[in-house]
């Protein structure tokens, strides 16, 4: 799936609900109802939901974070939050 400059390829499956939410966000972005920063923030919120629903830690690590190991989900969430901050900062610099 491609939204703005983001390529979403790291989640193998979406629930129907998440897919519907992503479609709504894409429509809002394409109709200028939301800006790129809002789109990015909302997409990352959905990503975090998807990650937290995943039960296979190694799959999460390999698909998203490229981390070698993880001790608990709090570390995972910290890493995701860091990457969100980095991504949003990069998007703001582009704008």
Range-by-range predicted roles:
Residues 11-95:
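Short, surface-exposed, charged amphipathic helix/loop patches that serve as local interaction elements
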């Amino acid at each position: 799936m491609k939204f703005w400059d983001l390529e979403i390829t790291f989640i193998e499956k979406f629930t129907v609900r998440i897919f519907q939410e992503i479609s709504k966000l894409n429509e809002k972005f394409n109709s200028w109802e939301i800006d790129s920063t809002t789109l990015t923030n909302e997409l990352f919120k959905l990503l975090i939901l998807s990650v937290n629903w995943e039960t296979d830690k190694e799959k999460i690590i390999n698909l998203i974070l490229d981390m070698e190991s993880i001790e608990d989900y709090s570390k995972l969430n910290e890493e995701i939050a860091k990457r969100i901050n980095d991504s949003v900062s990069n998007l703001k610099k582009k704008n």
